Amino acid sequence: MVKNKVCLICLFLALYFLFSCKTGNSERNLPAIHLKGTILQPDSILLGHKVVAIVDSHLVVPTWKNEYLYDVYKMKGDSLLLNNRLISRGQGPYELTVSEEMYDVLSGRFVIYDCNMGKGFLLEGDSVGKMMDYTLWKSLGKFHNEVYISKMVIETDSTVVTAFMQDGFKAFLGRYNLNTGKHSILYGLWPDDGFEGSDYVKQTVYANGSLLKCPDKNLFLVSSQMGQYVEIFRIEQNQIVPVSKLFDLYPQYEVANDGLNVRYSRDNMRGLDICVTSEFIYVMPDRGTMEEYVRDIQNSDSYNYTDEIFVYDWNGVLRKRFKLDYDILTLLVDKDNHFLYGKSIDKETSDEYIVRFELDGRF
């Protein structure tokens, strides 16, 4: 009898541990490695909120300026020197009005696209010279009609994998052929979050999160915009095959009163910021719930910023937990896992700056 009770207790603990691992709770208990950051001082006002690419010791930073979409800074020691500007705002053949981007950290290529215009470019980013030469840009053409593409990542020289919204399909991932302009749907991943309403509303929740690819393997990653859901998958022919969930805290939401949009519960965790290299997945959970955010944001300019990063391999195994000495908003890691870059803020002056953290010897 005692032996049976012991077995039941062991089984309960094992199940609890497994559940905690899936939901991301157990990661909090992993000993933290503390990282010391260095502020990179810009030679001009920094009007961007993240680093999206690292090219030839240059950082590409989206800007809020009216004329251009990106500023390009050269790193010199602990300084940032404004070196160039990339992509004018407008309706011209080499212009966009707003932009999203996907950077392939291994090859240096990245896609810059405007979801509203249905237009984008593939840039060769292995050198600043190539990146700035618009004659080398490959146009993506008009990449949506009935389908609205919100995210895309490079799969091959001729295809990108997309996150999309198009009513009537229980899927939110697809493949767009750059040569033919054809968009096809990839089935096999439809998160079991309990929502039974419109397919389009559910697509909106997951198509506006993160979509990333392992630079040298047939492995991809998606996350939700709210909640804390992260899943690794691969593609076999035209089918998605789930591989591993890093977090499965699904978002809580419903159809808004207009019948089209999403209304999120204020109990939702506020999502995650993620970047990847060939070896690792860096996950930075946002701080608090939506309710806490709405309540506290008025009293703290730095509420959006956090100091904790979890590092997984592409098998879904947690490898490290980093604790930063600066709170950051977004993150990007170079292809060799040598440095991590994040946007931070001075809590007293509200000045914004980029911080660099050294990762050498941490793995």
Regions inferred by a protein language model and the residue ranges of each:
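Structural signature of eukaryotic scaffold interfaces centered on beta-propeller domains
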Residues: 48-54, 100-106, 150-157, 203-216, ...
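Short, conserved, GDST-rich strand-edge loop motifs in beta-rich repeat architectures
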Residues: 164-165, 284-304, 346-357
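Blade-loop segments of beta-propeller domains
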Residues: 81-111, 115-116, 137-144, 199-200, ...
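Beta-propeller fold detector
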Residues: 31-39, 81-90, 129-141, 183-192, ...
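Asp-box/WD-like beta-propeller blade repeats and closely related beta-sheet repeat scaffolds
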Residues: 116-118, 125-157, 163
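Beta-propeller blade signature
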Residues: 74-75, 171-178, 297-317, 354-361
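Beta-strand-rich domains and repeat architectures in extracellular enzymes and scaffolds
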Residues: 39-70, 280-293
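A short helix->beta-strand "capping" segment at the edge of beta-propeller domains
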Residues: 25-47, 317
